[in-house]
Regions:
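Active-site rim/loop-helix segments in enzyme catalytic domains that contact anionic ligands
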Residues: 3, 7-9, 26-144, 299
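Sec-dependent signal peptide hydrophobic core
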Residues: 10-15
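C-terminal segment of classical bacterial N-terminal signal peptides
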Residues: 17-22
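C-terminal accessory domains and tails appended to enzymatic cores
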Residues: 28-34, 39-43, 180-193, 205-310
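Structural signal for conserved beta-strand scaffold positions within catalytic alpha/beta enzyme cores
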Residues: 49, 79, 117-119, 151, ...
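Histidine-centered active-site/metal-ligand motif
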Residues: 53, 161-164, 230
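Internal alpha/beta domain cores that form substrate/cofactor-binding pockets in large enzymes
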Residues: 76, 115-201
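Residues on a specific face of well-ordered alpha-helices
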Residues: 101, 105, 168-169, 173, ...
Length: 310
């Protein structure tokens, strides 16, 4: 299923009452509800949002990223593909340029500090050696001292887009290899040091082992603003939807003109539908769901009880 079909399903659910979003499967383990906290308890920590496509992060994790930035994180965006395929009626070159401009607007709206473009060809990432992508990510994790990542679930079920699962598997491997002194030791001559990524928030388009649900109510407007910067991609979704409605001899007046008003309406309905559906299960207005992997708690408890000053 293409991402635009996911949006189309969300919009159809909102407009026509037809639920079409893929359900996520909760794990048997306890699900942690993560809520906003006051102050900046995460000051000094670094997160990286790593996705192949510009709109992946805003849709699946935009609220949680905004929440953590508000709580003190410094954030970076790593885009692995060049997004050359995601437009409705533009040429390849126009598509790359449009999405590149939109990426700059997203960076500004999100509060992320910097973007790193790896520039691999969209829909062709399964041609690549994953060790190459992994090596580049190891370098960035060490350079930026990344503590927390957001990316696609490397074990997400029924994922048809190779860019998604190739990126996800490279991210997962790089997270722990970046802490090894024998992995890419030439980095150390340049002043870098081993650094493992301690925490992962994985999202998926299909069924997933969910163990962390984040209350994004306070950050929902920021998430909405971030998705609205993805104008080239959202325009693609709207035009696709309009074309399918024409085949049924239907139209939605608010979406008929592909302009800022249509983009605002489309993103509002799509995100309200999807994020409310997640939140409703847990008594929240809006929520995002993840498979979360963090530091081993028993060892953390042991350290907190037994550490002494040097």
């Amino acid at each position: 299923m293409e991402r635009r079909d996911l949006f189309r399903g969300a919009l159809a659910a909102g407009l026509f009452g037809v639920p079409q979003l893929p359900a996520q499967t909760a794990s048997a383990a306890d699900i942690v509800i993560e809520r906003a906290v006051s102050g900046t308890p995460h000051k000094g920590k670094v997160l990286a949002l790593i996705t192949p496509h510009l709109d992946d992060g805003p849709f699946f994790a935009g609220g949680t990223v905004a929440k953590l930035l508000q709580e003190g994180y410094t954030g970076y965006f790593i885009r692995t593909s060049n997004d050359e395929k995601d437009s409705y009626d533009l040429t390849l070159g126009e598509t790359v340029l449009g999405n590149e401009r939109d990426a700059g607007a997203f960076l500004q709206a999100s509060g992320l500090k910097q973007m790193f473009d790896l520039g691999y060809r969209n829909h062709r990432m399964d041609d690549l050696a994953r060790t190459e992508i992994r090596a580049r990510l190891i370098f960035l994790f060490r350079l930026l001292r990344v503590d927390t990542i957001f990316s696609y679930d490397p074990w997400g079920h029924y994922e048809e887009n190779p860019d998604h699962y190739v990126t996800a598997q490279a991210v997962e491997a790089a997270c722990w290899m970046s802490g090894g002194h024998l992995d890419m030791p030439e980095h150390f001559a340049a002043g870098l040091k081993p650094h493992s990524v301690a925490e992962k928030y994985y999202f998926a388009r299909g069924p997933q082992l969910v163990n962390r649900v984040v209350d994004i109510g306070p950050a929902f407007e920021t998430k909405l603003a971030c998705l609205r910067t993805c104008r080239t991609m959202v325009t693609h979704m709207i035009k696709d939807l309009n074309a399918s409605l024409v085949e049924r001899k239907l139209r939605v007046p608010a979406l008929s003109g592909v302009n800022s008003a249509a983009i605002d309406e489309f993103t509002k309905v799509a995100l309200e539908t999807s994020d409310r559906a997640v939140g409703r299960k847990y008594g929240l207005e809006y929520a995002e769901a993840f498979h979360h992997i963090g530091p081993e708690q028993p060892m953390n408890d042991y350290i907190s009880r037994h550490t002494v000053p040097l």
